C-alpha cells in the first residue's frame, strides 16, 4: 500500500470516451494481500494494489478526508449488509479507478461527499440486501465533480441480490457540472421488484445526467427519474427481456410528491427495447407529474436494434 500524495485529482478531469474507458483488461494487475483499510481525517493518500476480503465490514473505509486515490485494488467477499467494497463519508476529491469489486453488499457507497470520481472499474455480483445492493450509490453527495464513468457492472442471476445498479439519492450537482453517469456497461439485475438500472432523483436532487450507458436486462426498470430538478437521460441503450419482475425501460414519475418536486426533465435520443412481465412492449412511461419532458418524441421506443449482443459475452475480465 502506498500512502503518498494522491496521483489523480478528481476535479477538472475531462470525460474519456466510452471506447477508451471500456477497453481496460486488468490483465497485468497484481495485488498484495491486506486486511481491511480504515482512515479518518487523513488527507492526500493513495491506496493501491491491495487484495482485501471485506468480511463483515467495509473493505476500505475513508471518512473526513481530502484528496484520496484508490486504484488497482481487489475487494471481495463480504458476509453481511455492512460489507461494502468502499465506504466514503464526508470526503472531498476521491478518485476510485481500475478496481475489481466482487461479492460485497455494495461496490462504492459515498455519503455526504463531493468530487467522487468512479471510473474504469469492474464490479461483479452485488449481494445486498436492501438498502444496499448497488454497484455505486451516492447518498447526499453534492457539488461539482461527482462522476460514474466507463465502468463495467454485472450481476449474475442466482449469484447476486441487487437493487439499483446505480442509485443517486438526495444528491445535488451544479449547473454546468452535473452528477454524471456516463458510458457504463451494466448487465443483469432482478429479481427485486423495486430494483433496476440507474435511478436518478431518488427522493429529490438536482443536476443529474445519465448518458451513453448500455444496460442489458438490468431488472425491473432500465433508467428512472423518481423526482428532482434538472434531470437528463440521453443517448442510452436499454434492453430488457421478459421476466416475472420486468416493468419498464425508462420512466419519469415523481414518487416523492410530498417531499420533492420534479421539473426541467430531458429524456432524449435513447434507444429502448424493453418487455414487461406481461409480455408486452413497455419501453417508456411518463407518470405525468414531472411537467413537460423535453425530447420525449426523439427517442426510439421498442427498437429491435437494441438486443443482448450490443455487449460482449465476456464483460468482466478482472479476477
Locations of regions flagged by a protein language model:
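Acidic, glycine- and Ser/Thr-rich low-complexity intrinsically disordered tracts
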Residues: 3, 11-35, 249-319
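Extracellular beta-strand/beta-solenoid scaffold signature
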Residues: 30-36, 54-61, 79-88, 102-110, ...
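N-terminal segments that cap or nucleate solenoid repeat domains
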Residues: 13-69
Amino acid at each position: 500500500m502506498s500512502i503518498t500524495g494522491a496521483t489523480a485529482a478528481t476535479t477538472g478531469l475531462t470525460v474519456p470516451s466510452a471506447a477508451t474507458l471500456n477497453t481496460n483488461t486488468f490483465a497485468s494487475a497484481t495485488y498484495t494481500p491486506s486486511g481491511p483499510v480504515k482512515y479518518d481525517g487523513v488527507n492526500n493518500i493513495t491506496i493501491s494494489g491491495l487484495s482485501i476480503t471485506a468480511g463483515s465490514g467495509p473493505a476500505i473505509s475513508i471518512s473526513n478526508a481530502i484528496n484520496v486515490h484508490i486504484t488497482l485494488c481487489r475487494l471481495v467477499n463480504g458476509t453481511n449488509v455492512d460489507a461494502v467494497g468502499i465506504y466514503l463519508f464526508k470526503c472531498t476529491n476521491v478518485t476510485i479507478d481500475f478496481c475489481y469489486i466482487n461479492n460485497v453488499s455494495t461496490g462504492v457507497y459515498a455519503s455526504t461527499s463531493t468530487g467522487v470520481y468512479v471510473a474504469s472499474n469492474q464490479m461483479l455480483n452485488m449481494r445486498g440486501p436492501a438498502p444496499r445492493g448497488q454497484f455505486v450509490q451516492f447518498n447526499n453527495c453534492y457539488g461539482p465533480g461527482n462522476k460514474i464513468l466507463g465502468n463495467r457492472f454485472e450481476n449474475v442471476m442466482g449469484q447476486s441480490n441487487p437493487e439499483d445498479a446505480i442509485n443517486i439519492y438526495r444528491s445535488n450537482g451544479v449547473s454546468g457540472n452535473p452528477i454524471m453517469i456516463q458510458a457504463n456497461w451494466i448487465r443483469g439485475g432482478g429479481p427485486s421488484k423495486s430494483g433496476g438500472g440507474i435511478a436518478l432523483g431518488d427522493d429529490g436532487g438536482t443536476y443529474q445526467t445519465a448518458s451513453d450507458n448500455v444496460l442489458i436486462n438490468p431488472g425491473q426498470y432500465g433508467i428512472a427519474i423518481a423526482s428532482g430538478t434538472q434531470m437528463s437521460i440521453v443517448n442510452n441503450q436499454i434492453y430488457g427481456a421478459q421476466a416475472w419482475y420486468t416493468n419498464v425501460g425508462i420512466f419519469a414519475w415523481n414518487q416523492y410528491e410530498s417531499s420533492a418536486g420534479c421539473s426541467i426533465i430531458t429524456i432524449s435520443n435513447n434507444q429502448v427495447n424493453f418487455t414487461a412481465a406481461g409480455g408486452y412492449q413497455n419501453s417508456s412511461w411518463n407518470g405525468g407529474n414531472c411537467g413537460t419532458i423535453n425530447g420525449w418524441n426523439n427517442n426510439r421506443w421498442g427498437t429491435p436494434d437494441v438486443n443482448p449482443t450490443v455487449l460482449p459475452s465476456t464483460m468482466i475480465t478482472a479476477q
